[in-house]
C-alpha cells in the first residue's frame, strides 16, 4: 500500500490536511518508517480530485458511502438535480464509467465537473427514492427520504461550542483507504496539547510549538507550528448539516458536506448536551471514523521522558 494511504490520526486533522499557513505532512510507510514533507493550507491533492457544485448549496442533502476504495458521494436538491461524485482511490471516474439509476430506472447523466455526474430526478418531493450508482461491478445505493431533512445548523453550532470548550477528551480513530486499517488512540488537552499512539506502535506528543516522536527506541523532539485543539475535530468546518434522524435517547444524527480540511462528507452523532460521540469523514482514499469520550476526564499530557 502507498505510504500516503496511512495518514496518521491527528495528522489528518491537523498536519497533513493543513494548519495555518505552513504545516507538516506526516506519513507512515509500510515498514513503519516516517517521512515528513512541507505543505500549505489547501494544498492536498484531495482538493482537486472531484467537483460537486451543489455541495455547498443551502437547500441540498449531502450523503456519501464507500465500497473498498470506491467513494460515491452525492448532493441532492428537492425536485432535482442530483449530483454524484465518483472516485476510485485518488482517481475520479469519467461519466461514461458511471451509471445512475433512480428507483431501478437508469437515468441519463450529464457532466458537472471532474468526477461529477448530474441527473434530473424528482427526489425529495413527497416520497422516498432509492438512488443506485454503479461503477463497474460495484453498486452503491442510497435511500433518499421523502423530503429534504430539517436543518441541523443549531445542533452543529452547539456541537462546535461544546466540543471546542472542553478541557480534555479522548478519541479513537479508524482510518482506511479501502484496504488495511490504521487504528489510533488520541488524548487531547486544551489549549494546545495532544498525544497519540497507532496500532503499529508509532507515538507522538505535541505541546504548543514543540513535538516529540518516538523513533529508533527514543523520543526525538523538534519544532511544531502550533495547534488549536478544535482543529483536531475534522468535522468542525462542515457546512449545511441536515438531521437524518433523532434517536430515542435524544441523540441527533447529522449529515453534512464541507471543503475543510479537504472536500468531504461528514456524519455526526450529537448528544443533547452538544457532545459529539461519533463522527465519520468520507473523502477520496480517506475513510475515517472517530469515537469520542472521557470528556474533561482525559489524563494530563506532559513532555515525554
Predicted regions: what is each one?
Residues 2, 34-43, 145-191, 245-247, ...:
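N-terminal leader/targeting segments and the immediate start of mature chains
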Residues 3-158:
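Intrinsically disordered, low-complexity terminal tails/loops enriched in metal-binding residues
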Residues 74-75, 121, 133, 171-176, ...:
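Short beta-strand segments that buttress and anchor functional surface loops
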Residues 106-108, 139-143, 181-185, 203-205, ...:
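Well-ordered beta-strand positions in beta-sheet-rich domains
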Residues 126-128, 163-168, 185-197, 204-211, ...:
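Short, solvent-exposed coil/turn segments at beta-strand boundaries
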Residues 178-235, 287-289:
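An acidic-aromatic
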Residues 234-245:
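A short, amphipathic edge element
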Residues 249-305:
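Gly/Pro-enriched, hydrophobic low-complexity segments
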